[in-house]
Structure formats: C-alpha cells, structure tokens
C-alpha cells in the first residue's frame, strides 16, 4: 500500500503521455479494487447520471493508518449537504426533468494520497479492459458488472487533495467542481483545465487579508501555514500581495509540518519561534482545523492569552470546533470566509436526520456516537472513551449543539452548478428525448465543462454562481471577529465584508477583556509628529525615529526639510509658519528711555531758543554769537528729533528721513562749534604774530563756513540716495536664533551698520577736529568766547561716542541687536546734544532769567586788546608762577573792529596789566 501511494504521487508530478498513464492507471485501478477490503465504506445512490463526491469525513490518521477521527462539521455536514442538494434537484420538476442524479461519495480522510487512491474509483468505467484471456472455472468467459460512469466530481475540500485528484481526472476529462479548495495554483487553466470552484481563490482571499491588516494599522506580521498546497500557496500569495502593496513586512513565516512525531512539542516550538519577534503580534494563518486547534492549545500552554492577534483564512472561517476549550486564546481573532448565507432548508433537513432515516450515509452512525458522546450497541463501534449507551432517540440540535458549517452553502452551489450544466446540456442534446439520450451519454467531459463554465444562476445565498475563464468564482467574503466578552451571545460577529474592496466596521470590533482600542502589531511604534523615520537595512517596517531639529520640519515620514527663509517650524514640526515680524515699539522699555530723554531735550532746546529770541539784543546773547548759536541750537534740536525717526515704524518716507537726519543734527552742531573754535584759534594765533585781524571772522563769514561744512554731509546723503534708494526690508538673520521659537523677523530700513557709521563718520570727524581746536585753545582766558565750555563739551562728547562704538558693534550678533543698537544710538545722540546744550547755553539762560543784573554790556575791545590778551596769554602760559592769584581776567569782544586796531605794545608785562579802551563796534 505504501508503495502504491508513492507511485501515485510520482505519477501526478511527472509528465507522461496520456496513453502511458492510462496503461499504468489500469493496473492501479485493479490494485484499488483490491483495497476495498481495507476501506469498504462509500455512499452509492443510483441515478441516471452519477456524480462523484469527495469529502474529508475523517481526519488524518496516525502513522500507518490512513484515517483518524470523524469530522462532524467539515465532513458530515458537507457530505449531507450534497445529499440534500441531490434530493432537492431530483424533486424539482424544472431542473433536469425525467433525469435522476445519483452519487458515489468517498472519504478522502484529509490526506491527498489517500484521496488519489479513492478517486481511481471514478475512472474505472472509462478504462477499457482486455478480458479475452480471462475464463471462468467452467471455461466460460466471465460476466463483468460495469461500474457506474461518473460524469463529474464534487470536491475535494483541501487544496492539496483537489490538486492531486485534478491531475487524474483531467486525463479522463472528468469535470471537477470544488466547494472549498482555494489554492491560487488551481487557477492555472493549462494544468487544471477541468477544475472549477464555487469559492474564490486564495489570491482574492490574500488580498482581502492584506487589506484587513493594513486597515488595522499593522505593518509587522508573522505567517503560519499548514504544509501543503493550501497553506503554503496561501501564505505565498499573502506575502506577494503585501510586498506589492507596500508598507507591510513579514517578520517570519512558519510552516507546520504534515508528518510530525510529537504534536505537542512541535506546536510548542512554533509558539516559541513566533515569540522571537514579540512586536509581531498579528499572525496570519492558512491552516487546517486540526493545526488551528493545536496552535491555540500551544499558545495557551505558553500563557500567551491576549498576546497573539490571529487573522484566519477561510479554513478557519466561523467554525466552532477548532476553538473548543480555547475560546480565551482565540478572543479577538479575525477570520475570513467566502460570503455565505445559512441554508434554512438544510438546517431542517439535517436536524431531522436519525439513525433510522439516514441509512444511506454509511458514516452517520459514527457521527451519532461522536455528536452525542455515546456508544451504539451495534458491532463496529469506535467510541471507546465513554460507556454511555446511545438510545437512538437523541435529536440533533436538541440533545447536542448544532450550527451549520460554513461551506454547506458552497457544497449545495457546486451540486447545483453541475445540475444546471447537465440541464442545459440535456436540453441541447436531448430536446425531444425523455431522460438521458445516447448523444448526451457519449458527449464526454469536455462538452460538459463548456456548459459548466457558462452557468449563471442565483445560489443558495442569493448571490450569482458563475465562473471565469479559469473556473474561479468571484471574490466575495464575510469578515468575522470572535468575541466572548461584553456580549450576550459569545461567538463570531460579522464586522465587515470584502468585494474587490474592504468594508470594515472597526467600531464593532473588540479585543481581549472588551478593549476597543486596536492593539499594535508593528516593529516600531509610529514616530511622533516632527520626527522622521530612519529605516533599518533589510527591514523597511522597522525604523528609528530622529527628530527634525533647527529650522527643519517633517516633510513626510522619511524626510525632514528646512523651512523657507521667512518661516519657522510650527509647534509640532509638521509644517512651517511665518516668522513673527517685530519692530521697536513705542511702549518698549528700550524706547521709553530714549523718547523720554529726547522729549526733555526738545523742551529744553525750545526753551533756550525762545529765551535767546526773546533776549536777542541783550549783551549775553550778542556776546555768544547769535548767528552760530541759532545754528547750533538747530543741530541740537535735530539730534533729539532723530530719536523719534529711529523708533517710528519703518516705511519709505521714514527711511528717507532717517538717512537725512541721522548725521545732519550732529553735523550742524559740530560744524558750528568747529567754526567757533577755529575762529578763536585763528584770532589768538594771528594776535601772536601781528595786529592785523585774520580773515573770515565776521558773522557772515562764520555762517558761510558752517554752511559749507554742512553741505558736505548733505552731498553725501544725496549720493547715497542715488546709489541705494531708500527701502524697507525684513531682516530674518538678525533674530534667527538657534531656537526657532525665538526667531523673529525685524522690520527695518535698508540701512546697514556700516552705512550708519559712514553717515555719522563725517560728524565724528568734525567732532574730533573741533576737539583738537578745543585743546589748542585751552589756554585762552575763560571769558574769551566760550573756549573753555566748548572744550569741556567736546571732551565729554568724545567719551560718550567712545562708549557708543564698542556697544554698537559688540552687540551685532546679539538676539537683542535691534533694541540695543537703536537705544544706544539714540541715547548717545541725546547725551551729545544735552552736553552741548547744558554746558554752552544753560549758564547763559540762567543769568538771563535769574540774574538779569549781570546781563549788561561790558567794555568793548579792539583788536589791539585781543593782541595784548594773546601776548599776555602766551606769556602767562609759559610762566605760570608769575600769575597773580590766578589767571588774568580778560574779555574778548565778539565784534572786534579791525579799523581801531593799533599795533601791539612790545614791553615787559608787569604784574598789573593796563587795558586800553576801544570803542565798541556793533
């Protein structure tokens, strides 16, 4: 027997010419007849046309035994479904009238090689036998009983069994319609051209399972397959489709061996292997009932209740038997099953079956014992685990649990598909003939196959039954989840369906302990917003999360990109947002102090100017040089005004005024002071040499010189306007800190630090020159035209600006650059103006207002007096020890009359000096 099985397996795999195979099969058929003593059971129903049936009535037996325990659901339910369908068809006057369908139903014992041996029964009638040499003992030729001719086969169940049988049936052109085989390989019309099925292939099922896994957010799963065509091809399809879809990785693929010595140890080892990838909690299963039951038991022994997330194929479907005593480990399992409906007529039929009315089913007594857990008194009972006697009065559904097996509908549809094909064939070939005509008997399987592929009728579920060119049914699946908690009716719950696309009701799903949140099955948890994935080589579903830093944002899952120049990342770094625009506000502490000082200075300047205008003809005002005083006060006023321009909101007009007035106020002030100190210096220097008055010392000349100095500043500003017109910009570099949250865009005029210094540079040059003259005239008697106050003013101003430069440039890289530089510049200009105003004009205003008695005209001096004073000053400066109790008190008349100048008296200077009165010149 073992050798026969091996030979059968080789024959189905090797390609022999049909004639050779037929000769070999003749011998095999004879051998098979001899095996009927070994497995004599089969169901025979007489009819005009006989259909074959292959069902897994029993499970696989242990080593050396072909058949094991009876399969109540997958075996008996399905077998009875065929008998029920035959009864319905034979009683239907509109389907195959005057033709009775018979059957020859065999047990495959869930084993492909055993099924192949059994299927040889179907081809016996087609094998021609040479009996010329055969004689009976009396010398007469024997009379052979011709076996029934099987025109088509319903089955088998397992894909590996169907493949093995299909290889034989195609040689004899016997059409085959399977009710459960879903292996993708059976869609190959070149190898399995006589094979059809009323269930969709696993390629559709695998696509549906991939869609389910992705819909649940799982990207890292393991696969588990029973050894054989169904399991291995199913996993192969799932793996291929998942790779094509992308975003789904297979942690490991585990195969359950068909032949195993110790089942418990093997399944415990499989569970341990699955736990090697703990993050891969989802397990996609393409396995038979027994393997499913064993794997659940092993998971329970490993105390992994709630860890694994099972995704079962249609071999699991909505079956109860594999879950018996393992309901807790199966909690939350998602299963798929070809779309079906409960056939109510079958329920009534099956629950009415008894030992008395179902004698045609040779395995029904064995089913009765297993179903009711009792022992029949008839001989041949196989029930050894109980002493309870069966009464025969038990009833299915009352004394035992009953639920219609998931493939019953498809068994019925397969029988009806064969019947419809025979019906159309009978109408075409036997139009005027009652029953099966000779043409139909001789038509052959190829013609019947053509009719099978063209059937189209509403099946038992109300859905169309049809086949494509490969013999496959369209893909329609129901999706279930096994739920036991928080439900009044524990069991499978319909949660969706798949017909070319997935429809999944996630809100109806629940997991262990009634949890509604979908548990993860990912290699790495999703990255947080603002992080990118860095995949690991070889495992695209495993990654490390790297945060986008600096001014980067998360462009997509894998990439961080820099924000545009004027933007920064948002709070969670999933996009960019505009950088806030800032300017120096009036209410800012950085602006309040300069504005306050400027307002005080403006008020003081206006007060001084008003006082001078009011007392314009008084001696003090006249002696201070009225023309240059008003020019100087104007410059001081502009120095205060620039504070408001520097703080005002930048626009083109404001920026234009900034350029003009930034250095103009200082330029006017220091141009006037320089003219004054230069005049004093020239007068005293000229007095040392001769009594001739120097040139350009009149008020008009002084104004002309001052205007010339100021015009240089204005010329530079106009050139600046021409080369670089005023404009406003938003400077993002100035406040682009390391922390993007602190980044700011500064709205400002298009003026660089260098341009500011250049604009002030000319004024600083005037200031330095004026300081030099102040130093040179430091020896002039203090009453001679403010030489000493001007000197103190310039010294103080230099100190202010020496402090300004390092602060201004030292904060160029500071985040507070806008505030510090603006405040420093405005305060420096305010201080410079205040120093000049305070030292040069406040004493005069004090005398004018509070001591008018001192505001009287003093003696006017001619240039001769100036010369004498200059000579005196020179000598006193060389002989400080000769000064009597301090410096000589002298006064330089503001309006020296050159016509009254007399040559200087060259004589020794006594301790007392006699001054000559010179008539005043107005």
Curated annotation (Swiss-Prot):
Extracellular membrane side: 35-590, 649-654, 724-753, 811-825
Principal subcellular localisation of the protein: membrane
Family, per entry: Belongs to the G-protein coupled receptor 3 family.
Organism the protein comes from: Pongo abelii
Glycosylated position list: 98, 458, 486, 572
Record GO biological process: adenylate cyclase-inhibiting G protein-coupled glutamate receptor signaling pathway; axon development
Signal sequence, renumbered to the chain: 1-34
Job description of the protein: G-protein coupled receptor activated by glutamate that regulates axon outgrowth through the MAPK-cAMP-PKA signaling pathway during neuronal development. Ligand binding causes a conformation change that triggers signaling via guanine nucleotide-binding proteins (G proteins) and modulates the activity of downstream effectors, such as adenylate cyclase that it inhibits.
Protein name as catalogued: Metabotropic glutamate receptor 7
Membrane spanning residue stretches: 591-615, 628-648, 655-675, 703-723, 754-775, 789-810, 826-850
CDD domains, alphabetized: 7tmC_mGluR7 (cd15451), PBP1_mGluR_groupIII (cd06376)
Subunit structure: Homodimer. Interacts with PICK1.
Cytoplasmic side: 616-627, 676-702, 776-788, 851-922
GO cellular component: plasma membrane
Encoding gene (name): GRM7
Residue positions binding L-glutamate: 159, 180-182, 230, 314, 407
Subcellular location: Cell membrane
Topological type in the membrane: Multi-pass membrane protein
Matches recorded under InterPro entries: ANF_lig-bd_rcpt, GPCR_3, GPCR_3_9-Cys_dom, GPCR_3_9-Cys_sf, GPCR_3_C, GPCR_3_CS, GPCR_3_mGluR7, GPCR_3_mtglu_rcpt
This protein's UniProt keywords: Cell membrane, Disulfide bond, G-protein coupled receptor, Glycoprotein, Membrane, Receptor, Sensory transduction, Signal, Transducer, Transmembrane, Transmembrane helix
Cystines in this chain: 67-109, 249-541, 374-390, 430-437, 523-542, 527-545, 548-560, 563-576
GO MF term list: glutamate receptor activity; group III metabotropic glutamate receptor activity; protein dimerization activity
Keyword Chaperone carried by entry: no
